[in-house]
Amino acid sequence: VTEAQTNGVNAINGIEVPNKSDAKEQAITDLNTAVDNAKKAIDQDSNLTDEEKQAAKDQIDSDAKNAQDAINNAKTNDDVKKAADDGTLAIDKDVANAAIDNAVAGKKAEISNSSLTDEEKTALNNEVDQKANSAKDAINNATTPEAVTTAQGNGIKNINATSVPTTSTAKEAAKKAVAEAAEAKNSAIDSSNLTDEEKAALKQKVTEAQNGADHAIDNATTNAAVTEAK
């Protein structure tokens, strides 16, 4: 009996209790890998400023810390897995939202560099913002990494599909009105009893006035300035 007791006690005492949980350690290692990959993805968002990239990375770090705390506080393997999955999903969403911001910045740069009036640019920028908000809503409401990826892809596609006209509708309409006025004036000149030389001199003035108006219209930045130039 004594021998059996001794053997049993020794066997029990010989069982080593690890200082750390293998399940938790593996989950944290996987989480850190996700963080590294996420930050590399942020660095690829070439349209974002350094400050915007850093803000996205800070959000990733914040979500990772919350996940790590949840992993460390988990009582069961299932709890560990859920905490890790939730953390990875949050990080995926951070990357997706930054990708949307990157697409928005690229499209808005295209709009800014166009020949459109301020009002036309504002309307297009608002359209881009609405598409971005819809995309982010879909991303933030996603419950799986696959759904996040889908929402991100659809959002970027919709933003990139925003058409930026090569010509301003307001400016083209103004030029058309000027051209019609010039045509009417030239017809009146042709119908007059002036000499050919006098007609030619007047038509030259019409052409110069039209060219000046067209130039002013091209350089106008607002609808009001376009109207004034017209």
What are these regions (language model features)?
Residues 1-230:
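Amphipathic alpha-helical assembly segments used for oligomerization, scaffolding, or translocation
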